[in-house]
Amino acid sequence: MTNAARPELDLLANRRAVETCLEGFLVGKQRAAAEHCMPAEVVQTLRNFVFAGGKRLRPLLCICGWYAGGGAGDMAAVVQAAASLEMFHAFALIHDDLMDHSDTRRGKPTVHRSLAAHHSALRGQEAASHLGTGGAILVGDLALAWSDELLHTAGLTPDRLAAVLPVIDGMRTEVMYGQYLDLCAAGDPTLDLDAALTVARYKTAKYTCERPLHIGASLAGAGLAVLEACTAYALPLGEAFQLRDDLLGVYGAPEQTGKPVLDDLRGAKHTVLLALALQRADAAQRKVLHLLLGNPGLDEHDAVRIRGILTATGARAEVERLIRNRHAQAHQALDQASFPPSTARTLRRIADAATVRAA
């Protein structure tokens, strides 16, 4: 089949295929836990978390990468490899919520809060909270281990598995470093825009967009030119995705984002948005920002004051400009790429949806 004759890449059908794979895998794990008299809440908590929502962006980009690299034929192994990325994402989010002391994710209690609530009646609040913390670490670790299992049982040929493992290893290393950078920067927002962009690139851009595309393309046996074209599209898109997240963390509607709108301000996240505001603020505005950012007792009245400064300094408008710029860069990269036309069209739709969103 020529590139021009390829059918349109059906994102909805591929998303359903990934979710069917995840559901079957986790149902099997629940059965195994029951057979061995393991605590039922462990797998159930992870299953609830995985299916509480989410865009499935990483597995979908993995599948797009496979098509971009010229993949053809049976997709079962590719879908399961893509599903392994969603399981890895669950691991990353569970631990991220714990580090950020977040109460909700996707409108539901975070894993550590859910496990604490499960045990609170019998153990008391303090003991249940401690168990929730330790339990969330273990559930996250289990998701990491199971992402490996999904990959290694996908039925990939030895050469394809050998091609993709270094990419996955690189992705995992980048995520850990990005998360550590984010941890170190939290609570101490500075004027350092480059540092904020570095966190965005390693914590989100590479892991969310670039590496999933690389993994899919590697599964198709793609060469260096395809991988470089994936990077040219994915890095600006991933940065735009994170910049939109930063805006939603301050201005978003909790009923749409599924997260409290005050968390990023209480945590004084070292985002591009806050770095720009601190750069542009006058002495009085900077004093207010340093007074309020990072205050665990910050309330909506305080948040209104901060939002006013972000708008008055032009920081919010500048982040919107950066998003538009990176969105355009992603589209321009597709103009230069030799991807099948149907794949390029799908990647354009993904870029549009990832950067103009309310959740």
Model-assigned labels for residue ranges:
Residues M1-A359:
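All-alpha prenyltransferase/terpene-synthase fold signal
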